[in-house]
């Protein structure tokens, strides 16, 4: 009887751990590392803007897998168009030039079950330190 109780408790702990992990990684987490005052922020990144972003990408264990900072060349892309992982499209939205954010991106908003080559394993949560370098728009901006 004692073995059955131990097995039931162990099974319940396992199930609780699985649900806690899934819940923890379900949403994009955005941390502000450097905030820009409203007086200095004359423009926020919006869907359709072409943005330039410096970043350092890490796995949860701290392994750096990519860094535009090390290359000295920010990445440039149209925001909200799916040209980057969904966690980036969501996490850069609303940033001001000069603002820095820490984006903790769960697998389903990153590279998911397939990962990315030999660099990013399947089901990886990614951590990016980002800085918005510039915003370029042609006067034709979509609403948030």
Swiss-Prot record:
Signal peptide (from-to): 1-20
Renumbered ranges of motif Prevents secretion from ER: 141-144
Q: Which Pfam family, giving just one, matches this sequence?
A: FKBP_C
Q: Domain named PPIase FKBP-type: which ranges?
A: 48-136
Can you tell which superkingdom this protein's organism belongs to?
Answer: Eukaryota
Enumerate the PROSITE patterns for this protein.
ER_TARGET, FKBP_PPIASE
Check the record and name the InterPro entries matching this protein: FKBP2/11 (IPR044609), PPIase_dom_sf (IPR046357), PPIase_FKBP_dom (IPR001179)
Q: How is its activity regulated?
A: Inhibited by both FK506 and rapamycin.
Q: Name one GO molecular function term.
A: peptidyl-prolyl cis-trans isomerase activity
- Give the EC number: 5.2.1.8
Localization, per the record, is: Endoplasmic reticulum
Q: Which UniProt keywords apply?
A: Endoplasmic reticulum, Isomerase, Rotamase, Signal
Catalytic activity entry: [protein]-peptidylproline (omega=180) = [protein]-peptidylproline (omega=0)
GO CC annotations?
endoplasmic reticulum
* Gene Ontology process terms (BP): chaperone-mediated protein folding
Question: Where is this chain primarily localised?
Answer: endoplasmic reticulum
Q: What does this protein do?
A: PPIases accelerate the folding of proteins. It catalyzes the cis-trans isomerization of proline imidic peptide bonds in oligopeptides.
Family (UniProt): Belongs to the FKBP-type PPIase family. FKBP2 subfamily.
- PANTHER family assigned: PEPTIDYLPROLYL ISOMERASE (PTHR45779:SF7)
Q: What is this protein called?
A: FK506-binding protein 2
Q: Which organism is it from?
A: Yarrowia lipolytica (strain CLIB 122 / E 150) (Yeast)
């Amino acid at each position: 009887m004692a073995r059955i109780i131990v097995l039931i408790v162990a099974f319940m702990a396992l199930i609780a751990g699985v649900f806690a992990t899934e819940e923890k990684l379900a949403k994009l987490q955005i941390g502000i590392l450097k905030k820009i005052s409203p007086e200095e922020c004359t423009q926020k990144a919006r869907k359709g803007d072409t943005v330039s972003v410096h970043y350092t990408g890490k796995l949860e264990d701290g392994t750096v897998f990519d860094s535009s900072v090390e290359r000295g060349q920010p990445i440039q892309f149209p925001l909200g168009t799916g040209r980057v992982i969904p966690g980036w499209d969501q996490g850069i939205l609303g940033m001001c030039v000069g603002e820095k954010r820490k984006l903790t991106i769960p697998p389903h908003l990153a590279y998911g079950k397939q990962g990315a080559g030999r660099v990013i394993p399947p089901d990886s949560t990614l951590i990016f330190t980002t800085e918005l370098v510039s915003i370029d728009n042609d006067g034709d901006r979509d609403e948030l």
